[in-house]
Amino acid sequence: MGTRKTAITRRDFLRAGTCVTLGSLVGLPLAESTHADRTKKSRVVLVRDKHVLDGKEQIHPITLGRMLDRAVTALLDASDPSSAWTRLVKPDDIVGIKTNVWPYLPTPEPLNTLIRERLIEAGVKGGNVSADDREVLRNPVFQRSTALVNVRPMRTHHWSGLGTLIKNYIMFVSHPSRYHDNACGGLGAIWHLPHVKGKTRLNILVMITPLFHGMGPHHFSRAHTWPYCGLIVSEDPVAADATGARIIQAKRDAFFGGENPINPPPRHIDAADTRFGLGTSRLERIELIRLGWTEDILL
């Protein structure tokens, strides 16, 4: 099995790398057929609840569950959370939950648990659900997956400007560092690899305590996080990331007392739209639904 996996990832990497290189050389987007429908708005739900954190910034799972249910129900115009989840997955699906395990700001374990519970309640077998990050290429559930749920916290990032939903799929390639050039502008190519393409059912950008400033690789300072107490949920990863980026930028400007651009600029968000056709990054093409707590919403 190891030989087969290596052969696939090498071939897939070369295929994606060709797209990145050609796009960079000629300065043009990929073929128009890869682009999202330009006439349709992407729905993004921002849900916030100040009670999701206690005084010690520990997460209340019940409150978090209510936030998740409200967001998914609103996203799909469903009558209730159960019907929303049954529209996202079917009982015969094999679902990988792509998390993020960066130790300073990982995907909250209560959220991983909630997603797993909702998937099983929707009829997916427990043995066909797995949450993973760095071992996705070796995880048997991910190797057989028919569906993915993409969930991670937003934070500033040394190479890509922002750690985003788009960037979260970098572990689906065998050599992630090869995507660091040009502020990781080619990350969108990963989403077109055969073992990823078309599988993502839901994107959840965790904005509970996002990191809005950092200096150097793997830098983290609690002083540069804040209790935003939110989740951004969408079927469109680009629209979700663009919304989160607006919040991070607004927080930076407020904190530093003036314009303080994200550095390096998160070029991969716009490129995911204009070069790779993964969704929309433009404000006028995003339908933003705000739910819950509105104080200091920054949007």
Regions found by a protein language model. Give the residues of each.
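N-terminal and secondary-structure boundary signal
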Residues: 2-299
